[in-house]
């Protein structure tokens, strides 16, 4: 026998709808309790209602008014960085844990392959799609040697970027940069996002450049391979696009690193692609898949801990 805690999702857009389907199909310790939006004509709300999930188009106030709210343990916020602060304040007052899929970053950054088991804050931030894909590679290099500078470029299909993503571009780059440093271990980070308008849409592709102290290239390759396997455990479509590349930067020909200055050492280049599971959008939307898969893993962990501690607000027994 195992228990399942009820969760709600605020934001029935691309990310919220994909996450709802993942929770319903693959949630180990969680189940859907409610889907919340602000547009009564939202496709995501209509889909949730057809799937038997309680809905409200009255935002956070609508969630509080639902009968099921008293049973909700965890809320996933897939709205915007601007809206998230109020949502979090309201939910914390009711003892509900929050998983933040916006770049608001009120709580600690969480990337399952790096620190899922070590974090259990009232609010946990899932960084960004680009961060979920690339920061594990920076962390893998940091396990072997000191990383002075890491730069990531996330290229996603324009079709997979909804209004929330587009409204949060500045927050995306800043949040990802900070997480490159805090979770990736780089002294300095930089993040770039590209919305690719190509037709047919291309799957998510990511590039990671890291400048580190000299190190055994074989050990770095092994560390990267292990980290790729860790991410694939919850995002099967995550993979290396090609062999890891190395360039030795000599002291007589140093690189001028932004914010760091002249540096020599080892430059490591990692090329990734992320194919989505096509739960809601087509497989090219790997950027959504890696975010929602990471959030699902985080939600399952949160629920398991809440029930083990006896603080779950409401859950049911399930086979």
From Swiss-Prot:
Disulfide bonds: none annotated. Keywords: Aromatic hydrocarbons catabolism, NAD, Oxidoreductase. InterPro entries: Acetaldehyde_dehydrogenase, Acetylaldehyde_DH_C, NAD(P)-bd_dom_sf, Semialdehyde_DH_NAD-bd. Gene3D superfamilies: Dihydrodipicolinate Reductase, domain 2, NAD(P)-binding Rossmann-like Domain. It is an enzyme of class 1 (oxidoreductase). The keyword NAD applies. One of its GO terms (biological process) is catabolic process. One of its GO terms (molecular function) is acetaldehyde dehydrogenase (acetylating) activity. The keyword Oxidoreductase applies. Its EC number is 1.2.1.10. It catalyses: acetaldehyde + NAD(+) + CoA = acetyl-CoA + NADH + H(+). Transmembrane segments: none annotated. NAD(+) binds at residues 160-168, 287. It holds the Pfam family AcetDehyd-dimer. The active site is at residue 129. NCBIfam families: ac_ald_DH_ac, PRK08300.1. HAMAP family: Ac_ald_DH_ac (MF_01657). Belongs to the acetaldehyde dehydrogenase family. This is Acetaldehyde dehydrogenase 1. It comes from Burkholderia lata (strain ATCC 17760 / DSM 23089 / LMG 22485 / NCIMB 9086 / R18194 / 383).
